Structure formats: structure tokens, C-alpha cells
């Protein structure tokens, strides 16, 4: 072995190998930078690397066989009297070491500065799919291909599809439109700021099907991308739509395409056309509030495809909206069992809906929507869902951030901008709320909620007359606007202490709500009426109104003020029942309210310190405006004026949360009425 090493050294093999490795290393690193700059094909760099690898053993062999002399290159084994060029020596060692060092430094520099392979952050692309032109005459394709195409293109992280049913509804409001054809889709896209319209067609030729789709600029109609595929028979049509979606994604610049995952046939069974068509009809009916009718079509879809996960989740939502909670819970279990039949995007959306609407597990819902946003940053439903969940956890800054991301994708989204205005209102940023609400009214003058921030800003500024004017404008828009406005007008009167004026407004509003079937609105007004009756000393009338409200709705927004009135009426057991129901829920805000009621019962019994401890524990669960307000009152009752002043000051600073204290966009500014008095008492207790 030692002899071999000596011979390798004598023949300069080690030095030649080091020199070769250093030069090849530098060449490859340089090529990895220069070739992409000149749009060279990927195979050029691969060929260079392969050549370098293949060349290494060849160089070693040549170094063993040949030597460089003053007469040129000679075979080392030949006898010669020529003088060998001084290729060796310490000087050459330094040269080889230097080249290797340069190669190493260059490589480290390239890795540090370039980082991991960067994924190009593409701008979000919103897409509205127009009705396919069905030239086959087969109605089975109507409303089916559009849904399949949307599922396929939404697998691209930067693409989000605009709801077709919402688009059709908007198109109908803009003109005499009954179908979402290319012209109607372009009109809606321009109005809503949607970046692309996809218009497709399907035709049949001797049992084979040809599908063609164009991606259009909605303003000028320029074709930005197109794709065409064929299907051998009807059963292959949905799979062909998946291939079509893949081609369009590639043309739009999607580098994450995995055609095996994209194939629509993985999401639908062989009976998918029938299932997909029934599902599309169910979705449209559900969107338009026809829940009973949607149930039949969801079940039809499930009969055609028993593993149709999205149909189960849609059915569960409709059943829940109809109050059929037991059926809804059972259906949700089936939806969760069939998550595997969904695309990753649909799976995360479904989990977000389940956590937010069924279990009310806000933290898990936020996790699902955050995962959805991370993987599909253009998903408008993800940003909207994330914003709403942050809102319900009282993180208004995070809600504004997520809501702002939604508006970056859909700047023309009326609902998105209205929500953004309301988040600002709850955060107490009334100027921003009013400015955004004005933009909402510019987009859609019939959006009645855009007047709520205006009314609340006026009340916060002490201008009750301006608040009434805002409610008058709201009432003139629609029936729901009139319902909210009547509660708002009564709320203003109660804030001013004019309970006598509030009662007839509430009574008339209740009658209108009951006539229109608006149970929640009627229940909320009954609770407000009960508060007015209690304030004027008519406890019996107040309890009667309270019980009527609870019969219509027993959500937190009704139960919590009901419990407060039960305590006032001395019916502590009924208050405890409500508290027990609230603390047994998963949602932290509900449990915090339950603990607040328990604390107020303790306070009523003279247990001031225990009540304060209970209120503090409630705040640790959820920092709610109403809990902080009552902790201030408890502190003051117990003689802790400084602590009470801190609580009341915090409530004054968080006026936005009192605008609709139960986060349902229904006015409760009346709860601010006696806050200045309580703050004054606390300050008086400190001699201020």
C-alpha cells in the first residue's frame, strides 16, 4: 500500500485530482448561476455535472499514464533523458490548495446567499368560471363541469374561485340575466375585481367528447390561456376536466402541479357526473337560503356516491340551519369519515367549518384556516374564515389583518369590506370603520350593515341625532335593514334613558320580525324590551318579555342578559341554570360569561371577594368587555376604588366592543350609558 501511495505521488495523481475537482467545482457553481440567467434548458447543467463526474476517473488514469516534460506529454513508463517540467514541488501544492479553497468559499457563498430553492410567490389570481356551452344536448353536463374545473384549478396555491351562485345573483341584480354565460361572468368579474374569467364548451362526436376552455381578461376579452382535451366516453369526462385544469394551471404558471393528485377521478366515483350535478344544485339552493330543498339534492348526491365527503358536509350545514341538530351531528360524523375523498383544500375548509360552526372550537378553527392560508395563500374563504375566528376570539387586530388580505384578493368584495369595517368598529377605530363602510355603500348601496359603523361613531361622539339618521337610512334599504334599525333606534333611546320611547319601537319591531319569521331578531328585541321594562320598574312585564325571547332563541346573546335580569329579579336559581349551561360549553367566551353570572350571584349573596376571584378567572378565559365592566362594579362594591377605576377606564377605552357586545352586529350601545357614572364613583372614592 505504501508503495502504491508513493507511486501515486510520483506520478502527480493526487495533485492532478485536486486540481480537477477544484476547477470542476467552480465551473459547476458558476454554471448554476449563469445558465438560468440566459434561460438555458435544465438539461445543460445536468449534462455539465455528468461530464464532470465522468471526466474525473479519466483524468486520474491520464495522470497515471502520462507526464508533462520539456518535450511535451510522454508516457511515464518510457525511458527518457528529457527533463520533466517542474510540475511538482511545494509551489504546485499551494496552487492546488488555493484552487480547492476558492471552490469551497465560492460554494459556501452561493449556498448562503441563494438560500433554499425559492418558490416564486405568485400574485393571487381570482377566477370566475362561466357556464360551459353544452353542445352535446345532454343536461347531465349542465352545472357539473364548472364545479369540477373549479376544484381542479383551485389545487394551484395562488388560485381562488369566485362563487358561481353569488356571481349569478349579482349578475341578475345588474340586468335581466338568468344564466352565468361568458358575458355575464365578465360583467361580474369587472364589478368584483376578479382577474380571470374561464369560459368553456363541451361537444360530442360519435361517443367521444371534446372539452375546450379559455381563460379571459374580463375587461378586454383577451385570451390569456387555453386548453383542450378529449374524453373517450362519458365516464372519462370528469377525469378529462382534471387534465384540462392541469393544463390551465401550467399556462398560468403553477410550478406545484402534480397530475396524479389533480385527477378528478380520485375525488369522484364512476357515478360522479350524477352526484356532481345534484351537489351543484344543492349548493345553489343552500346559498339562496332554500335549506329544505337543498337537503333533497344533497341526499341524491350521496345516493349516487356514498363517499362524497363534500355532500355530507353541505347536508350537515343545511340540516343545522333547519334546526335539525341531531341529524346534523350524525351527518357531520359521516363527513369527517369521508375526508379522504376530498382534495386537500376542501378537507381543510371542511374542518374549519366544523370547528367554527359545530364545536365552536375557535382555536382549532384558527389552526385549520391558518394551514389553509399557508398552503393556499389565495384562498378567499380561508382568509375570511380566519378573520372571523380571530374576531370571535376578540383579536381584532388579527381579524383586520386577515380581512385585509381578503380585500387584496377581492377588492370589490362587498361582504369582505363590510366585515373589515365592522372589525374596525369593534376595535374602536371608528374613523376607519366609517371610511370602509362608505366604500361598501359605493360598491352596493343596498348593503344595510354599512350604516351601523356610522351610527356607532355618532353615538361614541355623543351625537344621538346623527345615529338616528343613520338608522333611518338603514331602515329604508330592506326588511332586515329595518329590523336592525328598529333595534338601533330603541338602543339609542335606552342609552339616553328614554325607556318609554324605546318600548313601542321594540314592540313594533317584534311584530314585524315574527311576521317575517326572523326568530333571532325577534328574540333579541324581546330581551331589549325586558331590559326596558326592568329599567322602568315593571319586573313582571320584564320577565314575561324575557321568557318570550328565550322561547325563540337561547343563544348566548339572549341567555346572558336574561341571567342578569333574573339576578335583578331575585331569581338566582334560574340565573345559576343559565350559568351552568354556559360553563359546560367548549367555547371560552361562553364559559367566561357563565363564570361571570356565577360571580354576580355570589356578589348578590355578599361574597364580594369570591365574586372578584370568579370574575378574574373569567377574564383569564376571555377578556370580555362585559366581564371587565362587572369586575369593576365588584371591586367598587368591595371598596377597591383604584382597581375599579382601572376596569372602568379600560371599558371606556374599549368602547368599540360595547357597540354590539355579543358580537352579532346588533346594537347594545345602551350598556355604555351608566359607565361614566361608575367611573365617577371610582374616582370619587380616590378623592379625584
Question: Language model features by range: what are they?
Answer:
Residues 265, 654-673:
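Acidic, Ser/Thr-rich low-complexity linear motifs
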Residues 121-135:
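Short beta-strand segments enriched in small/hydrophobic residues
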Residues 276-300, 305-624, 640, 672-675:
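Extended non-membrane alpha-helical scaffolds
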Residues 94-101, 105-120, 148, 152, ...:
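Catalytic-center loop of serine/cysteine hydrolases
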Residues 581, 617-621, 629-657:
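Active/binding-pocket-proximal capping segment
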Amino acid at each position: 500500500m505504501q508503495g502504491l501511495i508513493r507511486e501515486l505521488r510520483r506520478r502527480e495523481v493526487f495533485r492532478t485530482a485536486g486540481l480537477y475537482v477544484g476547477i470542476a467545482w467552480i465551473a459547476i457553481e458558476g454554471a448554476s448561476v449563469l445558465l438560468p440567467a440566459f434561460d438555458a434548458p435544465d438539461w445543460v447543467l445536468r449534462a455539465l455535472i455528468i461530464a464532470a463526474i465522468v471526466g474525473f476517473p479519466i483524468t486520474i488514469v491520464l495522470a497515471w499514464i502520462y507526464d508533462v516534460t520539456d518535450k511535451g506529454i510522454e508516457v511515464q513508463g518510457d525511458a527518457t533523458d528529457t527533463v520533466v517540467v517542474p510540475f511538482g514541488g511545494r509551489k504546485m501544492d499551494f496552487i492546488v490548495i488555493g484552487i480547492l479553497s476558492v471552490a469551497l468559499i465560492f460554494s459556501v457563498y452561493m449556498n448562503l446567499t441563494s438560500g433554499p430553492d425559492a418558490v416564486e410567490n405568485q400574485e393571487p389570481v381570482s377566477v370566475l368560471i362561466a357556464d360551459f356551452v353544452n353542445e352535446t344536448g345532454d343536461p347531465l353536463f349542465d352545472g357539473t363541469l364548472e364545479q369540477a374545473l373549479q376544484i381542479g384549478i383551485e389545487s394551484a396555491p395562488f388560485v381562488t374561485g369566485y362563487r358561481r351562485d353569488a356571481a349569478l345573483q349579482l349578475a341578475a341584480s345588474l340586468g335581466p340575466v338568468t344564466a352565468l354565460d361568458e358575458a355575464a361572468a365578465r360583467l361580474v368579474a369587472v364589478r368584483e375585481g376578479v382577474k380571470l374569467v374561464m369560459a368553456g364548451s363541451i361537444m360530442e362526436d360519435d361517443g367521444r367528447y371534446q372539452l375546450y376552455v379559455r381563460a379571459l381578461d374580463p375587461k378586454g376579452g383577451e385570451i390569456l390561456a387555453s386548453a383542450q382535451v378529449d374524453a373517450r366516453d362519458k365516464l372519462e369526462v370528469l377525469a378529462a376536466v382534471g387534465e384540462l385544469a392541469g393544463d390551465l394551471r401550467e399556462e398560468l404558471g403553477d410550478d406545484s402541479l402534480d397530475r396524479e393528485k389533480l385527477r378528478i377521478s380520485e375525488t369522484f366515483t364512476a357515478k360522479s357526473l350524477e352526484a356532481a350535478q345534484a351537489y351543484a344544485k344543492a349548493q345553489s339552493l343552500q346559498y339562496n337560503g332554500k335549506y329544505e330543498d337543498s337537503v333533497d339534492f344533497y341526499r341524491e348526491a350521496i345516493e349516487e356516491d356514498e363517499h362524497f365527503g363534500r355532500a355530507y358536509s353541505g347536508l350537515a350545514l343545511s340540516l343545522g340551519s333547519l334546526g335539525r341538530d341531531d341529524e346534523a351531528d350524525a351527518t357531520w360524523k359521516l363527513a369527517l369519515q369521508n375526508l379522504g375523498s376530498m382534495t386537500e383544500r376542501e378537507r381543510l375548509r371542511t374542518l374549519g367549518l366544523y370547528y367554527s360552526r359545530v364545536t365552536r372550537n375557535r382555536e382549532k378553527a384558527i389552526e385549520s384556516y391558518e394551514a389553509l392560508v399557508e398552503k393556499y395563500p389565495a384562498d378567499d374563504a380561508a382568509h375570511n374564515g380566519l378573520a372571523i375566528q380571530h374576531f370571535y376570539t376578540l383579536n381584532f387586530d388579527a381579524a383586520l389583518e386577515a380581512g385585509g388580505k381578503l380585500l387584496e384578493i377581492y377588492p370589490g368584495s362587498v361582504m369582505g369590506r363590510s366585515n373589515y369595517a365592522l372589525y374596525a368598529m369593534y376595535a374602536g377605530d371608528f374613523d376607519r370603520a366609517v371610511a370602509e363602510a362608505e366604500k361598501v355603500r359605493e360598491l352596493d348601496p343596498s348593503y344595510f350593515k354599512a350604516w351601523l359603523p356610522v351610527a356607532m361613531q355618532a353615538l361614541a361622539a355623543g351625537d344621538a341625532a346623527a345615529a338616528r339618521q343613520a338608522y333611518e337610512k338603514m331602515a329604508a334599504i330592506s326588511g332586515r335593514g329595518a329590523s336592525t334599525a328598529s333595534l338601533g333606534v330603541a338602543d339609542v333611546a335606552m342609552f339616553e334613558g328614554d325607556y318609554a320611547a324605546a318600548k313601542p319601537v321594540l314592540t313594533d319591531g317584534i311584530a314585524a320580525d315574527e311576521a317575517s319569521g326572523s326568530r333571532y331578531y325577534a328574540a333579541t328585541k324581546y330581551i331589549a324590551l325586558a331590559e326596558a321594562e326592568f329599567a322602568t320598574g315593571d319586573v313582571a312585564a320584564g320577565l314575561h318579555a324575557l321568557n318570550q325571547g328565550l322561547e325563540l332563541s337561547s343563544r348566548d346573546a339572549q341567555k346572558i342578559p336574561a341571567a342578569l335580569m333574573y339576578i335583578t329579579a331575585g331569581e338566582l336559581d334560574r340565573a345559576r341554570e343559565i350559568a351552568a349551561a354556559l360553563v359546560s360549553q367548549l367555547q371560552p367566551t361562553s364559559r367566561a360569561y357563565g363564570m361571570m353570572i356565577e360571580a354576580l350571584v355570589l356578589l348578590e349573596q355578599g361574597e364580594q371577594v369570591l365574586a372578584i376571584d370568579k370574575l378574574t378567572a373569567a377574564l383569564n378565559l376571555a377578556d370580555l368587555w362585559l366581564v371587565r365592566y362587572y369586575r369593576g362594579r365588584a371591586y367598587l362594591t368591595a371598596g377597591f376604588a383604584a382597581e375599579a377605576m382601572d376596569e372602568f377606564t379600560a371599558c371606556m377605552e374599549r368602547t368599540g366592543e360595547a357597540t354590539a357586545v355579543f358580537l352579532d352586529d346588533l346594537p347594545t350601545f345602551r350598556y355604555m350609558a351608566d359607565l361614566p357614572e361608575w367611573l365617577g364613583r371610582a374616582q370619587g372614592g380616590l378623592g379625584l
